Swiss-Prot record:
Effect of K302R: Abolishes CDC20 binding
InterPro entries reported for this sequence: SPATC1, Speriolin_C, Speriolin_N
Region (Necessary for targeting to centrosomes): 1-76
Recorded coiled-coil stretches: 2-45
Name of the featured protein: Speriolin
A Pfam family it matches: Speriolin_N
Ranges where the record places region Disordered: 252-297, 305-324
TM annotation in the entry: none
Family of the protein in this entry: Belongs to the speriolin family.
Domain of life: Eukaryota
Source organism of this protein record: Mus musculus
Tissue specificity annotation: Expressed in testis. Expressed in pachyten spermatocytes, spermatids and epididymal sperm (at protein level).
Localization: Cytoplasm; Cytoplasm, Cytoskeleton, Microtubule organizing center, Centrosome
Alphabetically ordered keywords of this record: Coiled coil, Cytoplasm, Cytoskeleton
Length: 480
């Protein structure tokens, strides 16, 4: 009668677990669908942002020439892009043509006249310049033009990148007054000048330099401007990129201090391009730059080598060379093997038809009985199979309880011992295992020498349970 009562209670528990399992499956499906929806929304939003940004840059950079030496966007494009002039994408006539050519087309004159009052102060007096415009650096220019007089530039910007103005004719005028370049834009962007010829200025930069470093987008005084060569801004131009020399002016001692470059600069291009200015590549950096760069690379290589050296060292510590330590390690794994073999023996007696018991533990036997009893085609419970498995479970648990095994305490302790001590990595020799090498007395001595006193009593109980099960089925205690 007590067996029927326990069977009914177990059956109700199994049905309850089935319902909980179905609810958990539904919850997991909802969570997965929610995560997939979030991922799809993020991917779609990111794609829209990137495509819109690159499309806007492509439209701003595209401007067909309408007059010789003057590049003006179409009226429709100007209407759609009202900020193109602010971005410096509207290019005006070359600097020399503005000053020397008395006649311009009506379209060009309308744009040049408002700048006439600005061009003369540019060459004779102080001019305010901003360096917030990034498009001026995209204009290819010759690196040989330098100033003869004191200038005030922002960090990371040289005169070549500030002017950035290859012109259709030679520019021989020299700047005879100091220039003030506040942070915000470059000279090319403030003038809006683009050219199709070469810029030839033979003067050299010999005056004092004052640096303004209040621009939020520029690097500090001791650093340089980091330029990404894979940026869509660079890909929008059809001409090679001229990277300025990596020299930061020093306002104290008037000496250009080279800094370690942060980007790989473009190789110098041989020859001239038709319709564009001649590109004379960046000046070679000093030996200090090479030394610092090589020092950083060498330090990185040392870190990688050190990491590779430490990794096998940690792995080798798991297998000590000392024979005494090796014996201790084997004894610890024998403790875990005893607990593992007891779990495996219990599961094999309940599920003898299963070869692999991955995911099966004594703690989840009721749940595994339900899973094994469900028909995979119609998901109906096979009551006969469920009853058979339940009887096996009740029989072996009653046998172990007579030895002192507690179904609420010892399954968790078994898992703890396996996780703490591990199991044997390799199968012992077949003759040794069958010849009685792992006897009860030997394994008891191992437990006494290895297990902590707080767990020793339970560990000895697990060993006695394993010995009883092996005696009942006539097999060795360690089944491989």
């Amino acid at each position: 009668m007590s067996l029927l009562t326990s069977y009914e209670g177990l059956r109700h528990q199994i049905e309850r677990l089935v319902r909980e399992n179905e609810e958990l499956k539904k919850l997991v499906r909802l969570i997965r669908e929610n995560q997939e929806l979030k991922s799809a929304i993020k991917t779609q939003a990111g794609g829209l942002c990137i495509s819109g940004f690159t499309g806007g840059l492509g439209e701003a950079a595209a401007g067909p020439p309408q007059h010789q030496g003057v590049f003006l966007p179409p009226a429709s494009a100007a209407a759609k892009e009202p900020c193109s002039e602010d971005l410096g994408m509207v290019a005006l006539a070359p600097l020399a043509d503005m000053l020397n050519t008395p006649q311009l087309s009506p379209a060009a004159g309308s744009l040049v006249n408002p700048l006439a009052a600005t061009l003369n102060p540019l060459l004779s007096g102080q001019i305010p310049l901003l360096q917030n415009n990034q498009f001026a650096n995209l204009v290819p220019c010759s690196m040989s033009n330098q100033l003869t007089n004191p200038t005030t530039v922002s960090p990371g910007v040289t005169l070549a990148s500030s002017l950035g103005l290859p012109s259709t004719g030679p520019l021989n005028s020299q700047m005879t007054s100091p220039m003030t370049v506040p942070p915000g834009t470059t000279l090319a962007s403030s003038l809006g000048l683009t050219s199709t010829g070469s810029l030839t200025t033979s003067s050299r930069l010999v005056g004092p330099l004052a640096v303004s470093q209040s621009s939020p987008i520029m690097a500090p005084l001791a650093g340089t401007v980091a330029v990404s060569l894979s940026s869509p801004l660079l890909s929008s131009t059809a001409t090679p990129l001229g990277v300025a020399q990596n020299v930061v002016p020093n306002p104290i001692n008037n000496i250009g201090q080279p800094e370690t470059p942060r980007v790989r600069r473009a190789e110098p291009t041989r020859g001239n391009f038709s319709g564009t200015s001649a590109y004379a590549g960046p000046a070679p950096t000093s030996k200090v730059n090479d030394t610092r760069g090589s020092r950083v690379m060498e330090q990185s290589r040392k870190n990688v080598v050190e990491m590779e050296r430490k990794t096998p060292h940690r792995k080798s510590n798991k297998l000590p060379d000392n024979p005494r330590d090796t014996k201790q390690l084997v004894c610890e794994r024998l403790v875990g093997e005893i607990a593992f073999q007891l779990d495996r023996r219990i599961l094999s007696s309940i599920f003898p038809e299963r070869v692999r018991l991955y995911g099966f533990t004594v703690s989840n036997i009721p749940e595994k009985i339900i899973q094994a009893s469900l028909n995979p085609s119609n998901h109906k419970l096979d009551e006969d199979l469920c009853q058979t498995l339940t009887q096996r479970y009740v029989s072996i648990m009653n046998k172990l309880q007579s030895l002192g095994y507690n179904g609420r305490v010892h399954p968790a302790l078994t898992e703890q011992l396996v996780n703490e001590y591990g199991i044997l990595r390799e199968r012992p020799e077949l003759a040794a295992s069958e010849g009685g090498c792992y006897t009860v007395d030997f394994l008891q001595r191992v437990l006494l020498e290895t297990v902590h006193p707080s767990k020793l009593t339970d560990a000895l109980l697990l060993l006695s349970c394993l010995h009883q099960l092996s005696h009942d089925d006539g097999k060795p205690m360690f089944i491989w």
